Amino acid sequence: MNTITLFFLFIPILAVILLFANLLLAVHRPDSEKVTPYECGFSPVYGQTRNPFSIQFYLVGILFLVFDIEILLTYPYAMNLYQTSTYGFWIFVIFFLVLTVGFVYEFGTGALYFTDKRSSIQNTKISDSKHSPFFWSKSEKRL
């Protein structure tokens, strides 16, 4: 029997056996605290679902996703580093330059600030000269 065939047969069978063993042997003690929804550190919302919350959570999630995908795409390149041609190297350099420019832009617009006046949630226009994404005014201090 082929090794891959063995894995395709053995792993699902083992998973089903372990799931049924868990259902049969696990202690079931339902509690009101255990069955309540947990919503990212907030109290569960009952009734009205239109409560205000900070949009920064979504912004951080999207930024995390973008840079997590960057790491995911970097790993195969790192594994084949010695087999990559000059063309592949320059494609990778351009990839990192685009991500670096994006990070500098996010930092400049204040997307990474939560409690500062420079937060991007204030809907400042990037076209304004005093709100340029790459420069701060003289009255603002950089961290």
Swiss-Prot record:
Describe its membrane topology: Multi-pass membrane protein
Predominantly, its location class is mitochondrion
- Output one GO MF annotation: NADH dehydrogenase (ubiquinone) activity
Reaction catalysed? a ubiquinone + NADH + 5 H(+)(in) = a ubiquinol + NAD(+) + 4 H(+)(out)
The record's subcellular locations are: Mitochondrion inner membrane
Spans through the membrane: 7-27, 53-73, 88-108
Q: Name one Pfam family in it.
A: Oxidored_q4
GO CC term (a single one) = mitochondrial inner membrane
Do you know which InterPro entries this protein is assigned to? NADH_UbQ/plastoQ_OxRdtase_su3 (IPR000440), NDAH_ubi_oxred_su3_sf (IPR038430)
> Keyword annotations for this protein?
Electron transport, Membrane, Mitochondrion, Mitochondrion inner membrane, NAD, Respiratory chain, Translocase, Transmembrane, Transmembrane helix, Transport, Ubiquinone
Enzyme Commission code(s) on record: 7.1.1.2
Per its database record, what is this protein's job? Core subunit of the mitochondrial membrane respiratory chain NADH dehydrogenase (Complex I) that is believed to belong to the minimal assembly required for catalysis. Complex I functions in the transfer of electrons from NADH to the respiratory chain. The immediate electron acceptor for the enzyme is believed to be ubiquinone.
Q: Which family does it belong to?
A: Belongs to the complex I subunit 3 family.
Q: Under which name does UniProt file this protein?
A: NADH-ubiquinone oxidoreductase chain 3
Organism, by scientific name, is Mycosarcoma maydis
Q: What is the lineage of its organism?
A: Eukaryota, Fungi, Dikarya, Basidiomycota, Ustilaginomycotina
